[in-house]
């Protein structure tokens, strides 16, 4: 702590040849820019409001088909085809994802006569093997019960 009873001169505390730095001059700032003049607001009736569009399933399929044909023909890139259809990329990929499972279900083909006969034969063999396995397991269980004296 500082000694309060010390009444020595302040000049004695500071070295006489110490480097004394002059306070640095403050930087001058340029004056602030004036605020931009606000543009007059347009009337609500003048600007057409962007209303959300709802497309039917048929319209979605048509737009997707149009985009695919443009891209496969090599006329334009995928991004350009999507923009020309008037939808966003996100919308395109969402539509593509929802339409694809429906098409995959429709593409499921039925087995032909020869394949059907093979399936029937395999199912019969599967049943026969299951019965054989069940008989073996029953015999093994009976043998273990006799050894353990449970029967």
Swiss-Prot record:
GO terms for biological process: DNA transposition. Residues 24-35 have a biased composition (Basic residues). SUPFAM superfamilies: Homeodomain-like. Pfam families: HTH_Tnp_1. Residues 1-61 are annotated as: Disordered. GO terms for molecular function: DNA binding; transposase activity. Keywords: Nodulation, Plasmid, Repressor, Transcription, Transcription regulation. InterPro entries: Homeodomain-like_sf (IPR009057), Transposase_8 (IPR002514). Residues 11-23 have a biased composition (Low complexity). Belongs to the SyrB family. Seems to affect the transcription of cya3. May be negatively autoregulated. This is Probable transcriptional regulator syrB2. The gene is syrB2.
